[in-house]
Amino acid sequence: MAETNGLSNMELMRTLDDSWNAQDWKTFEKRHATNTVVSWPGQADPTRGINNHKAESVEFFKTFPDNHLINHPYKVEIAQGEWTCTVADFSGTMTGPMKGPDGKMIAPANKKFHVEFCTVAHWKDGEIVEEKLFYDLVGLLKQIGVM
């Protein structure tokens, strides 16, 4: 039973990443619980709630409009019960401004990044209740010339 649940959650994960790549915010919202908790690299505190997670995701696309996760196939995909873990190549170009850790805006660098991106997701009833996102933030910032 858990295996079937894990496999169906993995398929939902793939459709979530498809929605990310297409900026299909309706599907993106459907894949997350209303009170989802999301941790990104560099955050002091997790993002709470789908509305806040969607808002930060839309902002990310303003900075990196061509960003893309390669999820067909994933480099790694693991599903067990209510949990999925995926590793994908993640790339994009900084063509929009970005808010720095000090709150100041960083001008577009027009430089590309390419890092591995790992998502660990906890699923309940077909929605992510907790999502942990991992990628080499320092490497990304160095590649776009911010560090």
Task: Identify the role of each PLM range.
Residues 1-147:
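C-terminal and inter-domain tail/linker signature
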